[in-house]
């Protein structure tokens, strides 16, 4: 991040007002099409800076060092690269990408808020506490797929703190994006929340169970070792190390704001798969 004079770093009142309007419009769009807003409302306007570029390798990137989100120009209004396209004009897949990146920004915000940069760290958010517990006991040692196309060929890896945090962060963001995409798919063009239509809620649950059983909620990490990074830029987790069921329930409750009776029904639909090594640490879906 470029150094600049202190006075140049202070936004004008017009800048602040403009940022607040953009964020208010995003929240309003999300509410109108019945999408989750719980974690979005916890993000202060202006925390994340959104940019657009012609991205060729990835649909989006998030840079926590300067809280910057880079989206493909296709997610901008008229593909002009100046402002975010109205959410109602985005496809379900585009909204999946957007929510994935916005969740990265949310976790970044929680981490920054926790950091005692002024000597007085804010008490850790419950979701962040839960994340730290999961990082320690689920993402410290993982199974990976060295060859992505061969999902059954796996290897064990001991991850560094940086690698395990990225693996968790990406895995959780994959689920958040998936949850939003599939909510839009089951709601169709009815503009009615799936929580008010039992048939839609059941359809989402069926999709979730199928995705969970197929091991679709898997993140990745970038190896810290330079020699390994010369071989591959990303290591993808294997199905054995995908998102845990308890993690999904906590994210539904604390990040997405799903209704508790919906979460309880979904939990009851799963046969007991044994105790989670982290189930009693850091938080739960209340």
Where do the model's predicted regions map?
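Catalytic Zn2+-binding segment of zinc metalloproteases
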Residues: 101-122, 172, 179-187
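Pan-zinc metallopeptidase signature
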Residues: 14, 179, 183-286
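Metalloprotease/metallohydrolase-associated module, dominated by Zn2+-dependent proteases
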Residues: 136-189
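Auxiliary, metal-adjacent structural segments of Zn-dependent hydrolase domains
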Residues: 15-78, 112-129
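Soluble non-cytosolic domains of exported or imported proteins
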Residues: 13-21, 27-29, 88-97, 163-167, ...
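Short pre-active-site segment immediately N-terminal to the catalytic Zn-binding motif
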Residues: 74-99, 108, 160-164
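Post-HEXXH active-site segment of zinc metalloproteases
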Residues: 109-155
């Amino acid at each position: 991040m470029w150094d600049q004079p202190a006075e140049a770093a202070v936004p004008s009142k017009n800048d602040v007002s403009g940022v607040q309007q953009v964020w208010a419009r995003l929240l309003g769009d999300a509410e109108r099409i019945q999408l989750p807003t719980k974690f979005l409302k916890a993000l202060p306007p202006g925390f994340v800076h959104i940019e657009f570029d012609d991205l060729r390798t990835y649909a989006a990137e998030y840079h926590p060092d300067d809280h910057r989100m880079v989206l493909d120009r296709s997610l901008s209004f008229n593909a002009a690269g100046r402002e975010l396209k109205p959410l109602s004009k985005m496809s379900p897949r585009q909204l999946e990408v957007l929510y994935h990146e916005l969740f990265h920004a949310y976790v970044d915000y929680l981490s920054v808020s926790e950091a005692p940069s002024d000597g007085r760290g804010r008490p850790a958010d419950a979701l962040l506490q839960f994340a730290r517990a999961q990082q320690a006991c689920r993402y410290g040692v993982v199974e990976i797929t060295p060859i992505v196309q061969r999902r059954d060929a796996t290897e064990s890896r001991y991850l560094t703190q940086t690698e395990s945090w990225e693996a968790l962060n990406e895995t959780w963001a994959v689920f958040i994006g998936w949850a939003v995409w599939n909510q839009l798919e089951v709601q169709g063009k009815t503009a009615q929340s799936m929580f008010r239509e039992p048939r839609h809620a059941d359809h989402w649950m069926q999709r979730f169970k199928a995705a969970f059983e197929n091991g679709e909620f898997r993140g990745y990490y970038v190896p810290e070792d330079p020699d390994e990074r010369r071989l591959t830029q990303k290591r993808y987790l294997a199905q054995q190390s995908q998102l845990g069921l308890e993690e999904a329930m906590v994210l539904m409750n604390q990040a997405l704001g799903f209704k508790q009776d919906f979460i309880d029904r979904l939990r009851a639909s799963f046969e007991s798969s044994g105790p989670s090594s982290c189930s009693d640490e850091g938080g739960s879906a209340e």
